[in-house]
């Protein structure tokens, strides 16, 4: 006790502003459930596993720790499993996470000799008792909100429900025997709550479902709400009500009244149809989900170094799939595992290592690659009975990598490709003082775009990138005859949803990866291109090639496209991807003998003409509603003149902006530096980035297009020397080599949008394919090579 009293000055009583870590070691993935428990520094409130707490004592001199140990309670192993009603984990109605219960014990430990004192104890100094009680009762800094619904969010009351006008048509809806008013469909039927029309729903992605008559009726009449027949029961909240203008499932608090208008007694109705959410749950177990996750196959669990699963933190599968592949590359393994120990990273880290990207990447690398946490758990998989591993939760890494990013720091599902690009950018910036150690460089390569003007002169635009984003030319499908026969069969037999349950019956276009690469390298016209040779606008021809070949080639398949009306759609397509590809023919050769470069410079008036101007009709309509002219112009510009409704929504959400009354300006000084930084990360020069943002009103996507369409925008980096005597890849720090690559990683996506569904990784390790599905790791017997969203290749030389 005297030893403790002599160190009281090193004990702090936590303030409300203190971040208290007590669930996970900040250096490793040890927890209170680990064999050695967890040690909380009673001065900094950081937590350490038993193997690492001495490092903290050596670094800080803090001797007093709260030791937390959790021991598992015995529980019955034959708990009945309930069928989930919500696409979620660990919440009421969702999938049971089957978490065991633990008993927690505490003691005070004084380093360096690990002298232990019991807690609670009246003999402890009051300061220590208060400090420990505060830590024990506090919510740990690591603890995040548990996993909510993967895709479905809580339904909101429709803004049209309370003011819905119903037509007195005398229509009485029978309790059964329904049929679409415009075709012979008898399932997936929707009752329009305005006029009583019964119409079929949308056509599904695979060609099944309805014939779109309900949504077409809305487009013709603008009648907003419809309820799905077959989902109406005495529990009206369970009925599936859809709002077309809000484009979502909604609640109608007056549904009973609206149904009574058509003679429907909801209390006598019985449920015969699945709701949209239930159908989504059902589809999540269908073809894509089963194929990509290899459901139904006996996957052999695999354990050991490099085979550690990642716990899903709640819609974090995009992060898990990406990081498993990233930490299968030699560059990341070398940087954060082979050549950097945990102790080395901790010694270099600031006072709070939980906020240090280098520390947390090293922690994640050692967690995934050491094999320490890849061992069979005492609990077996509830569905297969096979040994399972608990996996490691990448909470601290996610907090650091997502810091200050509105989307990645949320619990919402994200695009795995966006996350990969974000990761590469963060790692590159963190390595700016030691570029030789930057592992993200292994993904980088040079791109050169050649612009051929009708004058015969050429321009070259060079930049760096870390992905090749490929359009999918569906017209290059190799199974056109099979597709045609399939669609004729469907049309002839009228195949319904229940007739197409077998995945073998679904025929999709098969497009070779070679066709996607050829499409990328093919010539394409550029409309409204300003030619400095002709001194006017014209149509030029652009061809694209690579100036270097990276160590790791990342190919992104553009499966998500926009249909007419800016409706997102996922292409239902297979990509035939060989194990080995050769892109040698895609190397760009630069300025060729006999070619003459376009003169430098773009007139200021051309740049000014590219600046966005508010649509006068949109502005006039908003002004007539009582908004100021300036505010309306800003709303139109910031929504790219998309329409009155979009501009109105922007206005309502930005009325409190501090600069809402500032004059509209396109000056360079008003350009957001973060937007400039984003374009810099794409490999553009700063002066080009600023010109592009100025010309596009600050819109990054439009600015990128502007750069591509104006390759002569900068004298500094697009002159003769840039084409004639440009740096070699080696001189610019880019890796380079031959054009042959071997497939080693696939990130696959299941779902209708990159922002919902689920991501899974398949990785070629030690000559065999392995599936990484969050914390489930097993030998893959049928990797979905033709269903990938992002493909990772390693250069063979």
UniProtKB/Swiss-Prot annotation:
Q: Where is the USP domain?
A: 308-796
What Pfam families does the entry give?
UBA_7, UCH, zf-UBP, zf-UBP_var
| Keyword check for Zinc | yes
Gene Ontology cellular component list: cytosol; nucleus
Which organs or tissues contain this protein?
Constitutively and ubiquitously expressed (at protein level).
Q: Which residues form the active site?
A: 317, 758
All residue ranges annotated as the UBA domain in the record:
613-654, 670-710
Q: Which UniProt keywords apply?
A: Hydrolase, Metal-binding, Protease, Repeat, Thiol protease, Ubl conjugation pathway, Zinc, Zinc-finger
Q: Does the keyword Nuclease apply?
A: no
Which EC number(s) are documented for this chain? Answer: 3.4.19.12
Residues in UBP-type zinc fingers run: 156-266
Please report which protein family the annotation says this sequence is part of.
Belongs to the peptidase C19 family.
Record-given protein name: Ubiquitin carboxyl-terminal hydrolase 14
Organism of derivation: Arabidopsis thaliana
